[in-house]
Structures are given as C-alpha cells and as structure tokens.
C-alpha cells in the first residue's frame, strides 16, 4: 500500500490493517513521502482515530529502524508520557526517573524535546547540564553506574527526521505521541506510561502486550493529565502476567490529600528544573511540597512496576523516602557530572 491509497482510506474513515500500517510507516520513515503527505496522513489518522492494529504496526516499524541500547540489569523501567494533555506541567516523568534510581530501580528514560508542551524531557535535562549527545554504549553505562540514563529520541530514531518538520508545523498531538513510549530503544519490558485520553489506557496496554512487555501501568487522570494526578482519580490499565486489569486510584489511597495542580505548570525548561530541584531538595518554595507529592505518586508506580517494590503502596512509600532523603536530587547532579565526563 502506498501513502496515497492510505490517505484515501483514512479520509473515508476506513481503518488500516497492521500490515497496511507497516507498509505506510516504512514509506514515511525512509523518506518516501513528502512533508505534505506526512502531515495529511497524521491529521487524517487522528481525525479517524488510531486503532490498536494501526498503533501496533507503526510501533513495529519504529522499533525495527531504531538504534538499540543493550542494557543487562535488573529492575529496568521507563517512565514516559505521550504528551498532548495541554497541562504544561513540570517534567513529572523526568523527575520521577531520578526518584526511581534513588530507590534502587534502573531507568532507561526515552524522550525528546518539546513538541506539544512548554518543555520536553530533553529540554529540562539539558538545562540541568546533562549531556544528551552520547552513544548507546554510554547510555548503558549511565544506567549501570548512576541508575538512570537518557535516550534522546532523535539519536536512536534517526528515521524520525522525515516526520519532524510536519509534526512541528502541525503543533498538535499525533500518533507519534503514542509511539514514543512504545518504542524505547532499550526494549524495556516494564513501563509506566501516561496517555492523553482515558480511552487509550487499555489499548496501549494491549499493544505493549503484543510487543512483549512484562509489567506495565498505563495511566490517565480524570483532570486530563497523562500522569497520576494529585488532584483527582486516575484511571489505570495494568498489564502483568499477560493479563490486563483496570482500576481507579486516588491520592487518599496512599495517605495523601487531594490538592489542586495550581503552581505546577511551567512555561520553560528552566522553571521546570527549578521546581524539580526544589521538590527533590529542601522544598522551600510555595509549591514544592505539592510537587514532591505528585512526583512520589508517579515514581512510586515505576518503583512497583520495576519489581523493586511488591505493591503500588510500597512503591509510593519508597519514593517518598527517596525524596525526603535528598538522594533523588543528588542523582540529577550525578548524571550531569557523569555525562560531562564521558568521552
């Protein structure tokens, strides 16, 4: 199937099969489509609504074309959101990664610069002095020696260069927001993934099951966050042992009070980093305690999924301990120093 045939089907609201999606994505990712065709394809796919088969096929192609990172460690996990929730919260999944590492987990963090929000994970890490342009082998060293390593998406998904222009010009979430968490170059089998729509929780878990994941939590909060929220209930689809369980969690389940998200939005990477450092440090700012609580909820989920904690409640408690001891904040400085040392 060529991209023109795919566009005709999508405009007519006809779903593509996994095989058809694989064919079209190979064209897109190998330079066989024009920017106009790529933009039209992404918009038509979004307007129709992406199906399980379409997401799976696209993820398979991106994995096939990725530059892999080989990391042989226990308790390896990724924390990643799809973005596109419009909340412009500080980089919560990035902050959570350092807490997980401080609690004994290992994080192979996959991310990029901002596309649809005020700041992406790469932006805030760069602001912290963490070197992004490192090899796959150096990423593996970071994970093994510091407990957390960052895989800058353009370095591992070079085929994405063909879609970068159309994505930026569209300025809205597309299927590529979903593909980021599904295409971790370290082939991580354990993940906490936030999605921009609650209807995606179970399908994303199902796609990851098809792709070989072992333990995954896919989350979406009722206030629209692609994270576990401190303000309201959060919908969860948990893949474990080949089965998917759906349930609802809320801050009170973990001994926390629900709090509004006022003060947790940022306009740039520097503001995001300041709030993260305050939350993981002395917590002197007006919103630092609130930020620390929401980080603990999300990091706790990753600690649980990694296998370090036996339950979600235990994971949240371990996250709070790691934050309170300032070990998590120290991990940011350790990773910055280590990456600058790498040659």
Swiss-Prot record:
Lineage: superkingdom: Bacteria
Catalytic activity: N-(5-phospho-beta-D-ribosyl)anthranilate + diphosphate = 5-phospho-alpha-D-ribose 1-diphosphate + anthranilate
Cofactor(s) needed: Mg(2+)
Residues involved in anthranilate 1 binding: 81, 112
Pathway the protein contributes to: Amino-acid biosynthesis; L-tryptophan biosynthesis; L-tryptophan from chorismate: step 2/5
Record: residues binding Mg(2+) 1: 93, 227
GO MF: anthranilate phosphoribosyltransferase activity; magnesium ion binding
Residues annotated for Mg(2+) 2 binding in this entry: 226-227
Gene3D superfamilies referenced in this protein's UniProt entry, alphabetically: Nucleoside phosphorylase/phosphoribosyltransferase catalytic domain, Transferase, Pyrimidine Nucleoside Phosphorylase, Chain C
Annotated GO CC locations: cytosol
Gene Ontology BP, a term: L-tryptophan biosynthetic process
UniProt: anthranilate 2 binding residues: 167
One Pfam family this sequence matches: Glycos_transf_3
Top-level class of the enzyme under EC nomenclature: transferase
Manner of cofactor binding, per the entry note: Binds 2 magnesium ions per monomer.
Alphabetized UniProt keyword annotations: Amino-acid biosynthesis, Aromatic amino acid biosynthesis, Glycosyltransferase, Magnesium, Metal-binding, Transferase, Tryptophan biosynthesis
Record-listed E.C. numbers: 2.4.2.18
Binding-site positions, 5-phospho-alpha-D-ribose 1-diphosphate: 81, 84-85, 91-94, 109-117, 121
Subunit-structure text: Homodimer.
Role, per record: Catalyzes the transfer of the phosphoribosyl group of 5-phosphorylribose-1-pyrophosphate (PRPP) to anthranilate to yield N-(5'-phosphoribosyl)-anthranilate (PRA).
NCBIfam families tied to this protein: trpD
Family under the similarity heading: Belongs to the anthranilate phosphoribosyltransferase family.
Name of this chain's protein: Anthranilate phosphoribosyltransferase
Organism: Cellvibrio japonicus (strain Ueda107) (Pseudomonas fluorescens subsp. cellulosa)
